[in-house]
């Protein structure tokens, strides 16, 4: 019954979830992405990301479910469009924890994200460069 209460919008109007709370509390332990897919709507950006995360050395951002298909919530992170309302800790909360990335996978695991509207926002390239100057862009 607890999961039903959390999933029902009438009883959980603020969309509280234990997973989001855990990600927020562990955000300082999480890594930033190794790549960003910059695409546009209806151009195969989501399909490309789902193909990439099927590789065993690529971890999906947490807003993407384990099957490699779009989750029920928004799958795009939109961080670099709305940096004024979200901070870097919020952004990091979407990615794997550093020790799981380095110890379990012996530094071979990479992670990334995609947002289909980054191409349309004029401030996104400079914001990405300021935070992640060595990021790989796809």
Q: Predicted regions: what is each one?
A:
Residues 1-116, 130-135:
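PAPS-dependent sulfotransferase catalytic core
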């Amino acid at each position: 019954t607890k999961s039903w209460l959390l999933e029902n919008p009438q009883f959980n109007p603020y969309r509280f979830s234990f997973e989001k709370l855990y990600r927020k509390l562990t955000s300082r332990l999480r890594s930033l992405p190794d790549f960003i897919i910059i695409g546009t709507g209806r151009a195969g950006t989501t399909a490309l990301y789902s193909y990439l995360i099927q590789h065993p050395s690529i971890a999906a951002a947490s807003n993407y479910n384990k099957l490699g298909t779009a989750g029920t919530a928004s799958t795009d992170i939109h961080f670099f469009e709305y940096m004024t309302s979200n901070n870097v800790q919020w952004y990091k909360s979407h990615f794997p924890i550093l020790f799981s990335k380095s110890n379990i996978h012996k530094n071979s695991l990479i992670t990334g994200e995609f947002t289909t509207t980054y191409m349309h926002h004029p401030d996104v390239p400079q914001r990405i460069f300021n935070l992640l100057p060595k990021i790989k862009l796809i």
